Structure formats: C-alpha cells, structure tokens
Regions:
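Conserved donor sugar-nucleotide recognition element shared by glycan-biosynthetic enzymes
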Residues: 29-32, 36, 91, 111-114
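Gly/Ser/Thr-rich active-site cleft segment
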Residues: 63, 73, 102-172
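Residues that scaffold the ATP/ADP-binding catalytic core of kinase and kinase-like folds
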Residues: 82, 94, 142
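Carbohydrate-associated surface elements
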Residues: 88
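N-terminal glycine/serine-rich phosphate-binding loop of ATP-dependent small-molecule kinases
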Residues: 1-81, 96, 128
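Phosphate- and other anionic-substrate recognition elements at nucleic-acid/protein interfaces
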Residues: 99
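A non-catalytic, amphipathic alpha-helix used as a structural packing/dimerization or gating element
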Residues: 35-38, 93, 166, 170
Length: 172
C-alpha cells in the first residue's frame, strides 16, 4: 500500500514454495490464488496493526509475480501443462541452441527456452497453444481480462531490444 507521496506505508506478503511434481517445479493454480488471498489478508493485518483501521476502498492494485516460466493456454483459457517455474533446469538443450542461434544468452528460465524445449521434445500440447504467459502475465489476465505484460515481465519471456522497449525483432 502506498501513500500520497508514492512511498510504501503497508504491505502484504506470502511465502511461496513450489512443488516438484513429476520432475517439474510447479505451483498449482489453486496455490497461486491461495497465495494472493494470503497476501491480501497479510496487507489487511498490516494496515490494522499500523493504523488501527480497515481498508474499505482501493483506487488501484498491483501485483508482483514471476517474470520467468511457462504457462501455455488453449483458446478456452485452459492451462495445457502444469506451470513450469523459473526453478526448472529442464531446458538446457533449448537454452544452448537458442543462445547459439541468437548470439545472445538465453537462460533456461526464459519462456522461449521452455517453449523451444517443448518443441524439441514434440510435446503434444504445442498444437493447442493460444497464448503463452508468465505467472505475472497470468495474474494480470485473470484480474483485468487482458493478456498483456510489462517490459520487466516481457524480458523473462524473450530478449528485449533496449532501444525500442519491445521484443528484439532481429531474433523473432
């Protein structure tokens, strides 16, 4: 929560812990929403403790979430494979090939590395992908109805051109 001078005056938080399921570090979508509820509850408690009042109205709300990982959705909005977090080290082959191709370091945590690794493995969900998001993009989509991500989150998906503040067109 920020005050009129844009300085923080209260905060909420949640300690995330991903789960290793079938060799993939992941969070369930239920865990994502449980975490957001816990974070908001923590904010309410912080405000009550510091100021003795209760939040009744918010002008705007922002979220900070992972800018790396892999959340592939079909056109109905169904998650096609479990969320693959930044912690996974299953994209080594893709990371190396893309780094060589682009002459630019592509870390294993980048969304493009996860997508290309799925392509190399010919994963069956690929033909159904309508959108690919990070956790930050997913939360924004669910809260606003828009599939957009900021430049910070976008840098975890694909290399960014610093001058244009867009995806690097020479690498697309």
């Amino acid at each position: 929560l920020i005050g009129p001078d844009n300085e923080p005056i209260a905060q909420g938080n949640h300690d995330w812990e991903n789960q290793l399921v079938d060799g993939i570090w992941t969070y369930s979508l239920n865990a994502v929403w449980d975490g957001l509820r816990d974070c908001y509850s923590s904010l309410l408690t912080d405000v009550k403790g510091k100021y003795g009042c209760t939040i009744t109205n918010l002008t705007s709300l922002g979220f900070s979430a992972m800018m790396h990982g892999y959340m592939a959705f079909d056109k109905e909005g169904t998650l096609l494979v479990p969320f693959r977090t930044w912690r996974n080290t299953i994209t080594g082959e893709a990371s190396e090939e893309l780094t060589a191709l682009f002459h630019y370091h592509i870390p294993q945590r980048f969304s493009i590395a996860h997508l290309y690794q799925a392509m190399l493995k010919k994963e069956p969900h690929l033909t159904k992908i309508d959108s690919l998001l990070t956790l930050a993009g997913y939360i924004n989509w669910q809260m606003t109805g828009e599939k957009v991500i900021g430049i910070g989150e976008a840098s975890g998906m694909f290399p960014i051109d610093i001058q244009t503040k867009d995806y690097n067109q020479n690498m697309i």
